[in-house]
Amino acid sequence: THCISSAASDVYKRQIYKIEFYAAADGKEVMAEFLDSLPPKHQAKAFREIDLLERFGSSLKEPYVKHIDGEIWELRIRFSSDISRIFYFTWNFNTIVLLHGFVKKTQKTPRGEIETAQKRLLDYKSRHALTTQNQ
């Protein structure tokens, strides 16, 4: 007989995800800078949510993540009355690229924030397409 239940076995088979912070073509670490800009406790909560995303990937659902548009999803972070969002997409099945973060001030997500994420997604893909084809 097996010592490990099938449910426990499924945990071991779970897809392993890698988190990557988007950096601009000039090397500017825009995602790292956003996270550094958050107050310490809000930053800690953001890293906790990023850890959940890394562990569970596409199986993570609301209230943690929400589909925004096309390939773009948002990681939803709330600390006290502060709300922030991190837009991301999945690349090559198991790499989650964090594209753009912002502190949310209004009920509706500003279109400009989504557009920034979309531009960064296209930039990331254009710079990484060749390396993917060579693997």
PLM segments and residue spans:
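Generic hydrophobic secondary-structure packing signal
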Residues: 4, 42-45, 109, 113
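Well-ordered alpha/beta subsegment
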Residues: 104-135
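N-terminal first-folded block
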Residues: 24-67
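Basic/aromatic recognition patch in beta-strand/loop cores that engages polyanionic ligands
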Residues: 58-107
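Structural signal for conserved beta-strand scaffold positions within catalytic alpha/beta enzyme cores
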Residues: 21-23, 98
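Conserved N-terminal entry element of GNAT/NAT acetyltransferase domains
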Residues: 13-21
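Single conserved hydrophobic/aromatic residue that forms the stacking wall/gate
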Residues: 1-12
